[in-house]
């Protein structure tokens, strides 16, 4: 502020059509009391990926590891949907890579302001031939939704609305996640 310079993060997943439906379901109370939420990013990055740029895997230039770089968009989406957490307990480790300063694996347990319990798992040490999608799960007393990237594997509520079947058809989840195993597969809309 003093220098007259603004800084903002870009979190485009907040604005996807699928997210709009999920946010509306959360905000309108369709889940009832939400009990459990989860953000899971189980991706793979090769050692060559980290070696291809001097900034990758460093505290000074990358700002963090698997959570700050690869998982940040999914974590932001979870907070966008659920609000802030009152309590967080976490741990991190370097499990599959060498010559990097930051974590490649982390897990956290949290309690959100509304009382829901949550889990975040973020890693670039989970090998997969095709990659695992980034996942958001929200489960409550009246509904459950499992979001894979920007598609839904599960969209279920105790009371069906007139748009539920259309949402399931339009946003049906398919194959592996873009960028999960190949960072060049993330298109401009994911950044």
Residue spans of the language-model regions?
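Active-site rim elements
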Residues: 63-65, 95, 124, 182-187
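C-terminal glycine/acidic-rich active-site capping loop/insertion
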Residues: 112, 134-137, 141-191
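A short helix->loop->beta-strand "cap" motif at the edges of active sites that frequently abuts
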Residues: 2-6, 115-117
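Generic beta-structure capping elements
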Residues: 40-42, 58, 91, 123, ...
């Amino acid at each position: 502020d003093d220098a007259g310079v603004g800084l903002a993060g870009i979190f485009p997943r907040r604005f996807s059509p699928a997210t709009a439906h999920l946010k509306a379901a959360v905000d309108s109370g369709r889940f009832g009391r939400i009990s459990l939420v989860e953000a899971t990013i189980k991706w793979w990055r090769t050692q060559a990926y980290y070696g291809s740029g001097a900034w990758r895997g460093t505290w000074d230039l990358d700002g963090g590891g698997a959570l700050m770089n690869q998982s940040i968009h999914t974590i932001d989406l979870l907070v966008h949907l659920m609000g802030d957490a009152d309590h967080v307990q976490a741990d991190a480790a370097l499990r599959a890579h060498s010559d990097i300063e930051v974590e490649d694996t982390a897990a956290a347990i949290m309690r959100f302001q509304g009382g829901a319990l949550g889990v975040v798992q973020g890693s670039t040490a989970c090998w997969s031939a095709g990659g695992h999608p980034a996942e958001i799960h929200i489960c409550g007393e009246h509904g459950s939704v499992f979001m894979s990237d920007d598609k839904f594997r599960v969209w279920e509520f105790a009371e069906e609305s007139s748009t539920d079947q259309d949402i399931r058809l339009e946003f049906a989840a398919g194959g592996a996640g873009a960028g999960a195993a190949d960072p060049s597969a993330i298109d401009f809309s994911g950044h």
